[in-house]
Amino acid sequence: MRRILFALLLSSQAFAFAGVSPEGGCGSCTIYRSYISGNMELWKKGMQELQAEFSRTSGPCTLYTLAEARYGYIGYLLGRDEKDLARPEVEIFAGEIEKLASFPEYRAETEAFRVALFGFRMGLSPARAMTLGPKALKQLEVAVAAGKDSPVVWIEKANSEAHMPAFAGGSKEKAAASFREALKLFEAGAGPEKCTWRYLNTMVLLGQLLERMDDYRGAREAYL
């Protein structure tokens, strides 16, 4: 489990198509394979494949998968304190969010990405937390209003709750409940799509949070 590297600060692979999962849903099997192996060169290759596919097709599903992959890559870089590498990726991510905003079917995901963007900017410049923090909270309200049934919205809610101070509403218990809601939504209906690294990552984030809460039994259950 330690090979799964992408616990984000505020914090889808080897099939035929990079930007489309085997059964036609959104997801990159190259990115997924990178996630489970911990091979970051493969992750970057997956982003290149997605970028090439989006240049050919301009498909919203591919754009979402590309932005999601970059979201994960930025989290990885910030987690390693590689801010010089993360900074240009954050600006590219911001541009991808604005492109995604033109597709109404991805409104909830767009608003969730905007929450994450505030987090990334604070990660790059912690001194800006006093000004960006309240904006992030307001954006989180927008995201929740846009997509209470979207697991990615609940992931950003959990990331925010896990890292914000208690006086601003932060709570590890609330964050754990939000991660569990995200997992429940991933599992609803037919379950998570193939090649979806975010589902696995949410289990890891929940497990790591429970470890910090000294709930080792809960953490073991999350990892399993």
Residue positions per predicted region:
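Amphipathic alpha-helical repeat scaffolds of TPR domains
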Residues: 20-33, 56-79, 105-124, 149-165, ...
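Flexible helix-coil transition and linker loops at the boundaries of alpha-helical arrays
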Residues: 51-65, 96-110, 141-150, 183-196
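Sec-dependent N-terminal signal peptides
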Residues: 4-12
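Hydrophobic/aromatic packing residues within the alpha-helices of TPR/SEL1-like helical repeat arrays
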Residues: 43, 50, 90, 94-97, ...
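Boundary at the C-terminal end of the N-terminal hydrophobic targeting segment
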Residues: 14-20
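Extended amphipathic alpha-helical interaction segments
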Residues: 126-189
